[in-house]
């Protein structure tokens, strides 16, 4: 049985981990053992926060819609209910974008929602 030396594969493995840990603070970016632990932990954070990002953006959209709705004398929930009753299907992302970039369009939607609520 011939002896297997792992110089090439080890070098490649270390290089891969240290490349992933580039820019990390202190030994986390330069020492292989510590860098490997940090790369694994970074992957866990990235996985969790890819899911959290969706919640945070939805929350941000709702806050923006609520702020804009209150300028027109409606609460967020009454605006959404009015839009639903008026048969207007606009998702929260688009509605928040309208509230920020096109206040006139948002005002028109708010009026339609208020009209649907009063009927």
Swiss-Prot record:
Keyword flag Ribosomal protein: yes
S-S pairs: none
PROSITE patterns per the UniProt record, alphabetical: RIBOSOMAL_L20
One term of GO molecular function: rRNA binding
Superkingdom as given in the UniProt entry: Bacteria
Keywords: Ribonucleoprotein, Ribosomal protein, RNA-binding, rRNA-binding
CDD domains according to UniProt: Ribosomal_L20 (cd07026)
Any one GO biological process: translation
GO-annotated cellular components: ribonucleoprotein complex; ribosome
Keyword Ribosomal protein appears in the UniProt entry: yes
UniProt similarity note: Belongs to the bacterial ribosomal protein bL20 family.
Function: Binds directly to 23S ribosomal RNA and is necessary for the in vitro assembly process of the 50S ribosomal subunit. It is not involved in the protein synthesizing functions of that subunit.
Name assigned to this protein: Large ribosomal subunit protein bL20
């Amino acid at each position: 049985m011939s002896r297997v030396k792992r110089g090439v594969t080890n070098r490649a493995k270390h290089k891969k981990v240290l490349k992933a840990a580039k820019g990390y603070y202190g030994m986390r970016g330069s020492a292989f053992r510590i860098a490997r632990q940090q790369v694994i932990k970074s992957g866990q954070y990235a996985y969790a926060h890819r899911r959290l990002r969706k919640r945070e953006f939805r929350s941000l959209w709702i806050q923006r819609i609520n702020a804009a709705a209150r300028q027109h004398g409606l609460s967020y929930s009454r605006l959404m209910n009015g839009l639903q009753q008026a048969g207007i299907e606009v998702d929260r992302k688009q509605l928040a974008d309208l509230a920020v970039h096109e206040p006139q369009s948002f005002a028109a939607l708010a009026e339609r929602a208020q009209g649907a609520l009063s009927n």
